[in-house]
Amino acid sequence: MKYTQYPNSSKLKRNSDRREHDEKLSDELHNQSTIYEDEELSRAEYDSDSDSSVEDSTDNENSGKEMDEKSYEKNEDHVEDHRKRKKSKIQLLDIAEFKKENLADLDYQIGNSESKVEKGVNIEPFNIDDEIKHGVFDKDGNYIKTENATENDQQDNEEWMNDVINTEEVNRLEKEQSVKTQNSRHYMVHEALNLLKFFLVDENETVLESLGRLNKLRKIAISKKNKSLKYVIHGIELLSDLINILEKKGFSEVYEYNRLKVQDAIEEEIFDDSSRIVNHKTKLWGFKWLNKLDEYHGLYTNYEMSYWQKSYFKNSVIVKFHSEPDRDENWIHVSCLSFM
């Protein structure tokens, strides 16, 4: 009858025999060390007694005292050293020897083990290098945490929480930026120039002067607590956006543009008549009464809006350019614009 001997079983037996031999050898060394330490302590005590008797028989009193003090200190050093060695109950595990003895077995077990994922639960492998950062192993393999291990764990938890908080904050800011990008205005150059022209009340008013005029309207609305305040601010924001768009497109000194200069720039940008605005024909505007914001009226031409602004609206309406989405921030108070 043949018996099959598995390589791993013989290997484990050899390791077991070797560990048993090492333990016996360690016990013998420990016993010898204990005997040696006890003998050393006895010799120290005997030397102390001998020195004391010699010093008592010495005629020179000063030299006797000096020798007695030195002998006493020497004896105390021996006793204290012995006590320290006796107090050291924890014999640390030799990590290097542990790795050397167990590396082959660990490799074999890992190579022949099943997947580390069982029933959807990840099994984290034992990492002795990571463990000794937070504690020590005694001779029997028991793990003992150091005093600062808890502090390190708390610090790791705090860092993890900070990462979570920072991630949530980044996601929130990204969403806000995405909304801002979606809501930001995008115009072709000729569209931006056409809108800019409506903010200039006459041929001589510059863009900078228009901003000053709108700011005065804002202050008046604040002082009167008028409903128009929000829509005057919308006008200031739209004008600022138009300036930024044109500057990014390469236009310089936009703040110095007046109606005449804006119109010249429009003519340079228009490629065909379909992009040209005809005041009496092109329907561009819708409006709402401030006291009836749920009712929309439009679309109307520049000519119609200009006439009603002078004779009918009485600064009680808000207006919106036809291409703008119907959102609150796109409605502007009529006093901000000049249609012709």
From Swiss-Prot:
Keyword Nucleus (UniProt): yes
Family note: Belongs to the LIN1 family.
Record's keyword terms, sorted: Nucleus
SMART domains linked to this entry: GYF (SM00444)
Region Disordered, annotated ranges: 1-86
Miscellaneous remark of the record: Present with 799 molecules/cell in log phase SD medium.
One biological process term in Gene Ontology: mRNA splicing, via spliceosome
Domain GYF per the UniProt entry, residue ranges: 282-340
GO cellular component: chromatin; nucleus; spliceosomal complex; U5 snRNP
Lineage of the species this protein comes from: Eukaryota, Fungi, Dikarya, Ascomycota, Saccharomycotina
Gene that this polypeptide is encoded by: LIN1
Subunit composition and interactions: Interacts with the cohesin subunit IRR1. Interacts with PRP8, HEX3, NFI1, WSS1, RFC1 and YJL149W.
Pfam families: GYF
Basic and acidic residues composition bias: residue spans: 14-30, 62-82
Protein origin, superkingdom: Eukaryota
Compositional bias per record (Acidic residues), positions renumbered to this chain: 47-59
UniProt name for this protein: Protein LIN1
Annotated compartments: Nucleus
Polar residues biased stretches: 1-10
UniProt organism field: Saccharomyces cerevisiae (strain ATCC 204508 / S288c)
Listed InterPro entries: CD2BP2/Lin1, GYF, GYF-like_dom_sf
